[in-house]
Regions:
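Glycosyltransferase-associated regions of secretory-pathway enzymes
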Residues: 1-124, 142-312
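Small-residue hinge/turn detector
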Residues: 125-135
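Active-site acidic Asp-centered loop
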Residues: 135, 140-141
Length: 312
């Protein structure tokens, strides 16, 4: 368990991105002995392509593959997808059928399982909570890029702080579930499934899940809310999102040193073209280089980092 990473002991890491990164960088590498699932999900008809595969490839190149099981869920068979095939030996493909997966859980038989939404936010919230309840592990959005091994964090359940544009205190912090970790059938996972059907959500809701997480947090504080900068550095450093809103544009230079961060979350710009020289393209090239070096074929079990300055 990482000590001191809470509002009461170290409030400055929740309001100062640079201090949060320094704290994260000081977290020593570790070996988590239990096999851990890493869950991802993508639903067709939305195309699975170059942007989507980077989450998987960065996970493969930063986690200890002897201790993790990387699971790519989809509502269709992705085995013949041209972006999946080159990394297929490192991941497990599963079909996402919410009605079937809900059997034997608190959600079995609910109409919520067949409800669809235009932007896929609500279905994504349902997915992450159900698979973590049923199988345990880590969930990450498909627009998350992994920077380092999550092993030091895996002995605890966690989510992370929703930027710095919200009010933070020991009592109230808006919570982001783009990256989360829960144990199979845990009290937290059970509570979230229990309250999920009763929480109102409109089709245009983007923070329904945050409302749900905050509700459960009022009654159960035995899980960790990490600082935003651990997983979403730019959002914490730039209240108005700044350059992080344009990760695919050429010429958006970053002077940020993300050294210490566990991931980068680039926020849903699926339709934006990837320009050569953009932040995304430069990071993609770094991940591809590391992937090529390691899987021709050496797996380094320790200190699996992508490097220092991910923006430059």
């Amino acid at each position: 368990m990482i000590t001191g990473c809470n509002w009461e002991d170290c409030p400055e890491i929740y309001t100062n991105g640079n201090k949060a990164l320094a704290f994260a960088k000081a977290i020593p590498e570790a070996v988590y002995p239990e096999k851990t699932n890493f869950h991802f999900c993508w639903r067709v008809p939305l195309e699975f392509g170059r942007k989507q595969v980077l989450a998987l490839k960065s996970c493969v190149t930063t986690q200890n593959l002897e201790n993790v099981n990387i699971i790519m869920w989809s509502n269709v068979d992705l085995s013949r997808n041209e972006f999946i095939q080159p990394i297929a030996r490192h991941i497990e493909l599963r079909i996402w059928d919410p009605v079937k997966e809900a059997e034997g859980t608190p959600l079995e038989g609910l109409r919520l399982l067949t409800k669809d939404d235009e932007h896929h936010w609500l279905g994504g919230d349902l997915f992450r909570l159900l698979v973590l309840y049923k199988y345990g592990g880590v969930y990450a959005d498909q627009d998350v890029v992994f920077f380092r091994d999550f092993a030091p964090l895996l002995d605890q359940e966690f989510m992370y702080q929703w930027g710095t544009e919200t009010v933070h205190s020991a009592q109230a912090t808006k919570i982001n579930g783009a990256v989360m970790r829960m144990f199979k059938g845990s009290k937290l996972a059970t509570q979230l499934l229990y309250y999920l059907p009763s929480m109102p959500a409109g089709f245009d809701s983007t923070d329904w899940s945050a409302t749900l997480y905050q509700h459960v947090r009022r009654y159960d504080k035995n899980w960790t809310i990490f600082p935003c900068a651990f997983f979403n550095t730019e959002w914490q450093l730039f209240i108005n999102m700044g350059e992080s809103a344009h990760p695919f544009r050429k010429g958006i230079e970053s002077t940020l040193d993300f050294d210490g961060a566990f991931s980068w979350h680039w926020h849903n710009k699926w339709d934006s073209p990837i320009e050569e020289g953009s932040k995304f393209q430069r990071l993609e090239a770094k991940v591809n280089e590391k992937y090529g070096q390691e899987f021709n074929y050496i797996v380094d079990k320790d200190r699996r980092h992508l490097g220092g300055n991910y923006g430059g």
